[in-house]
C-alpha cells in the first residue's frame, strides 16, 4: 500500500460516519441507495484527495465533497422518482433526519438546503460560509429565513 493510499484509508476511517450520515440524509431516486451514494463520495474523495490544502478542517472538507457530490448527482438524475421509504441502517450520531424534516429541507432548494444540512451537522456560520462561498452574513440570513420557512410549513401540516 502506498503512503497516499494509507493516508486516504485513515481519512475514510476517521470520517466514515459523517460520510454515511450525509449520504443517508438525502432522499434520492429509487435507483440510488445510500451505499451507492457512499461509494460515489469515496470515489470523489479519492480523486480530490490531493486537492485538500488545509484552509478548512479535514471534517469540513470531507463534508463539502460529500455534499457537493450528492447535489451534483441529484441534479444529473433529477427526473427519476424518489424512493418510497428511507434507508434502513443509519448511525446514531447523526442529526434529526426524520423523512418529513428532510423533505422540508429538500424543498428549500440550493444553496439553502445545503446550508441547513451543514447547520444540522454542527458546522458554524464561518465554516458554512467557506463551504458555500457565501459571506457569514449571507449564511446567517439564509439560515434564519430557511428555519422560519420550515417552521411555517411544518406548522401548517
Q: What are the functions of these language-model segments?
A:
Residues 51-53, 64-85, 94, 145:
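Arg/Lys-rich amphipathic alpha helix in sigma70-family domain 2
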Residues 18, 100-103, 110-114:
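Pre-recognition alpha-helix immediately N-terminal to the DNA-recognition helix
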Residues 41, 65, 115-116, 128-129, ...:
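Hydrophobic positions on the alpha-helical face of helix-turn-helix-like DNA-binding modules
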Residues 132-157:
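DNA-recognition helix of helix-turn-helix
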Residues 1-10, 20-40, 51-53, 131, ...:
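Short, charged helix-capping/linker segments at alpha-helix termini
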Residues 107-130, 156:
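Short amphipathic alpha helix immediately N-terminal
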Residues 36-43, 47, 56-68:
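Structural recognition of an alpha-helix C-terminal capping motif at a helix-to-coil junction
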Residues 6, 76, 80-106:
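Acidic, proline/glycine-rich intrinsically disordered inter-domain spacer in sigma factors
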Amino acid at each position: 500500500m502506498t503512503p497516499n493510499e494509507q493516508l486516504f484509508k485513515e481519512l475514510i476511517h476517521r470520517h466514515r460516519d459523517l460520510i454515511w450520515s450525509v449520504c443517508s440524509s438525502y432522499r434520492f431516486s429509487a435507483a440510488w441507495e445510500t451505499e451507492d451514494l457512499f461509494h460515489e463520495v469515496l470515489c470523489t474523495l479519492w480523486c480530490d484527495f490531493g486537492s485538500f490544502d488545509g484552509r478548512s478542517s479535514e471534517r469540513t472538507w470531507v463534508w463539502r465533497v460529500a455534499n457537493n457530490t450528492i447535489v451534483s448527482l441529484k441534479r444529473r438524475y433529477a427526473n427519476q422518482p424518489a424512493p418510497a421509504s428511507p434507508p434502513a441502517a443509519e448511525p446514531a450520531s447523526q442529526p434529526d433526519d426524520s423523512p418529513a424534516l428532510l423533505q422540508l429541507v429538500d424543498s428549500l432548494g440550493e444553496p439553502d438546503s445545503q446550508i441547513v444540512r451543514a447547520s444540522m451537522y454542527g458546522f458554524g456560520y464561518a465554516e458554512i460560509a467557506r463551504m458555500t462561498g457565501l459571506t457569514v452574513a449571507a449564511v446567517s440570513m439564509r439560515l434564519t429565513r430557511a428555519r422560519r420557512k420550515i417552521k411555517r410549513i411544518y406548522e401548517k401540516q
